[in-house]
UniProtKB/Swiss-Prot annotation:
One of its GO terms (biological process) is cell wall organization. GO terms for cellular component: extracellular region. This is Wall protein 1. The keyword Cell wall biogenesis/degradation applies. The lineage of its organism: Eukaryota, Sar, Alveolata, Perkinsozoa, Perkinsea.
């Protein structure tokens, strides 16, 4: 998967 920067 691609890392968008959304780290809940």
């Amino acid at each position: 998967m691609e890392d968008e920067g959304a780290g809940g």
